[in-house]
C-alpha cells in the first residue's frame, strides 16, 4: 500500500488534528501550485505508519535528471507543512522533523554534489557515506575550513529562500489553505481533483506563479 497501513489506535485531540490538517494542507497547496514540483496525488490526515498525515505526490513521468528549478520547487513543497503551522498557529511543532531532514539533505546535495550554488561554483565533494565505503577512508575532508563555512552558508541560504517563497505562496493563497484544511477535517482524505477544485484552478498551476520560482538561492 503506497500510503502505508492505517494506524487506527492513534487518537489526536482536536487541536492536534487541526494542526495536522493545516500541516498537510501546506504541502498539498504547494504541490498543487508550484509548477516544477511533482504534482499532487492525494492528501490525508488519517494516521498511517509513523506519520500522522500524508501528502502524496507522483511524477508525471520517470525522471533521471534533476533540474535546479525542480529541486527548488520541491523544497518549497517540503517546507509547506512547517510554514503552514507557523502562519496559522504562530509557532512550529516537531511534526516537520522528517520534512526538514529531507529538505536539508536535498539542499546539501545541491551545493556539495550537483554544483548548483553560484558562490561555491562548479565543484563537487563526495558524501561521507561514499568516503567511508571507498578507498579514501582515512583521507578526511578534502576542502578548507573557509569552504566548509561557505557550503554551510549556501545550504542555509537555499533553505531560507525556499522558506520565504513558501511563506509568500501560502499567505497569498490563505483562503485556499483554509479551504483545504477545513475539508480535510471533514473528509479526512482528498484527491488532487478535489484540492484543485477548492483552489479554483485546473490541474495546471496558475499563471503568475513564475515570480515565485525565478529567484536564485
What label would you give each PLM region?
Residues 2-14:
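P-loop NTPase nucleotide-binding/switch module
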Residues 1-5, 24-27:
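Short intrinsically disordered, low-complexity coil segments enriched in acidic
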Amino acid at each position: 500500500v503506497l500510503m502505508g497501513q492505517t494506524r487506527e489506535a492513534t487518537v489526536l485531540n482536536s487541536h492536534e488534528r487541526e494542526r495536522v490538517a493545516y500541516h498537510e494542507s501546506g504541502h498539498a497547496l504547494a504541490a498543487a501550485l508550484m509548477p516544477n514540483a511533482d504534482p499532487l496525488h492525494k492528501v490525508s490526515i488519517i494516521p498511517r505508519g509513523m506519520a500522522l498525515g500524508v501528502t502524496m505526490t507522483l511524477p508525471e513521468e520517470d525522471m533521471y535528471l534533476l533540474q535546479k528549478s525542480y529541486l527548488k520547487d520541491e523544497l518549497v513543497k517540503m517546507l509547506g507543512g512547517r510554514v503552514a503551522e507557523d502562519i496559522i498557529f504562530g509557532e512550529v511543532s516537531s511534526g516537520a522533523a522528517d520534512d526538514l531532514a529531507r529538505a536539508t539533505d536535498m539542499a546539501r546535495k545541491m551545493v556539495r554534489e550537483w554544483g548548483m550554488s553560484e558562490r561555491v561554483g562548479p565543484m563537487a565533494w563526495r558524501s561521507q557515506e561514499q568516503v567511508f565505503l571507498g578507498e579514501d577512508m582515512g583521507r578526511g575532508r578534502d576542502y578548507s575550513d573557509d569552504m566548509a563555512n561557505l557550503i554551510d552558508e549556501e545550504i542555509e541560504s537555499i533553505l531560507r529562500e525556499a522558506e520565504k517563497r513558501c511563506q509568500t505562496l501560502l499567505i497569498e493563497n490563505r483562503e485556499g489553505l483554509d479551504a483545504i484544511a477545513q475539508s480535510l477535517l471533514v473528509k479526512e482524505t482528498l484527491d488532487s481533483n478535489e484540492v484543485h477544485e477548492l483552489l479554483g484552478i485546473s490541474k495546471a498551476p496558475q499563471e503568475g506563479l513564475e515570480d515565485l520560482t525565478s529567484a536564485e538561492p
